[in-house]
Amino acid sequence: MTLVYIALGSNLASPLEQVQAAIHALGEIPHSRVVAVSSFYRTPPLGPQDQPDYLNAAVALDTTLTPDALLDHTQRIELQQGRVRKAERWGPRTLDLDIMLFGDAVINSERLTVPHYDMKNRGFMLWPLFEIAPDLHFPDGLALRAVLDNLGAEKPASW
């Protein structure tokens, strides 16, 4: 089994229900099981500010799937919950599932970049991850705690 960390975010169509349904759906992925779920956090949007706040969370998932197979499942879950992929970056969305870490793997493919390309600059991804994996080290050896301290991002409010 490989321990994978997935970031969840939603700011449309009842975010709490969206994220709860996504956590349930992640638990239904074959050859996988949810082993930890963070609290739910309220964070301001990244990019355009004329949209609702986000609900952000993190899930730890044990899986025997390949990274691409897991990505197929996370994208299927997003689509089933009404995710529409638009050219607009950082726009509002019903559900966003990002594979932040896939064990100690470093992946740079057309479909997937792991560790997530900008997670070390995003407190809304790091704080939920820190809650469920406070002793985590990134594949490059950096401690999550040190990255959070360096970023200086305040812990987000609870949802």
Where are the language model's segments positioned?
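N-terminal beta1-alpha1 ligand-phosphate binding loop
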Residues: 1-32, 37-44
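Short, structured patches in soluble enzyme cores that scaffold and shape functional sites
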Residues: 8-10, 63, 130
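Flexible, gly/pro- and Lys/Arg-enriched active-site loops
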Residues: 31, 45-54, 65-159
